[in-house]
Structure formats: structure tokens, C-alpha cells
Regions:
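Phosphate-handling DNA/RNA-contact segment within nucleic-acid enzymes
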Residues: 1-66, 80-81
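Replication-associated primase and helicase/ATPase modules
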Residues: 23-24, 60, 65-70, 81-125
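Short, acidic/turn-prone active-site loops that include or flank metal/cofactor-
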Residues: 46-51, 72-73, 101
């Protein structure tokens, strides 16, 4: 819609309204892959520069109490993880950061990779 910035959008926000634990990923293909693998509590932030205080507020208002930060394994992903963690902790939302190897992103996950990086978290969803 006109006047809406990608910086204001979390996708697919309505799909996670019943979860108190959310997984945040960078891109659309990342979130689609995680949903395909059964991690339906995942949201896309549309790029490392696009997590804002507005998005932290939205998650807080949706009742999110814990966030797993799952950015790509590159430097931009690592820097974004730190920024996201600070913004969420200002709203008293617990965070866990999963650090991926340099050349891996969640969109590349198969079932084994998802289980390796996220399996221990799934029981808390």
C-alpha cells in the first residue's frame, strides 16, 4: 500500500499471532523455507537494515516473549543480529542468536540443517 515502507513489514505476521516464540530471518526465501520445514513461527524482516523499533514494538504488542535471531552467516547478518537483540531487549523480549557459518543462510536449509541449527528450539514453540 502507498506510504508503507518495507521497514514497517514483518511477513507473514498474521501467521505467527498465536506464538510467543518467533524466529526472525532476513529474507523472503528464508522464511518460506522455514515454513516449508515446519517452523511456522518464523518471520521475514526484509533485509539486515530493516529491523526497526517499530518492528520490535509490533512483536511486543503481538505477545512475543522470545525471539530466535537467525540471520545469514555473513558480516551484515552478524551486525544485524546485534542490532535486533538490542532493540528487542529494550522491550524485555528474550533473545537467542543462532550463528550460521559464513556461506549459509536459512533459505539453503534442508531438514538436517534445520534440525541441527533449530531442533533444540522447536520443542519450545
Amino acid at each position: 500500500p502507498a506510504g508503507v515502507s518495507v521497514s514497517d513489514i514483518l511477513f507473514p505476521l498474521d501467521a505467527v499471532k498465536d506464538f510467543s516464540h518467533i524466529i526472525l530471518v532476513e529474507g523472503l526465501f528464508d522464511v518460506l523455507k522455514l515454513h516449508e520445514l515446519g517452523y511456522t513461527n518464523s518471520l521475514c524482516i526484509f533485509g539486515t537494515q530493516n529491523f526497526t523499533p517499530i518492528k520490535a514494538k509490533i512483536l511486543d504488542e503481538y505477545g512475543c516473549r522470545k525471539v530466535t535471531i537467525l540471520m545469514d552467516g555473513d558480516n551484515a547478518g552478524k551486525q544485524a543480529s546485534q542490532k535486533i537483540q538490542k532493540l528487542l531487549e529494550q522491550r524485555n523480549i528474550e533473545t537467542v542468536t543462532v550463528t550460521l557459518p559464513k556461506d549459509l543462510d536459512p533459505g539453503d536449509f534442508n531438514e538436517e540443517a534445520a534440525e541441527y541449527f533449530l531442533g533444540k528450539l522447536k520443542e519450545n514453540f
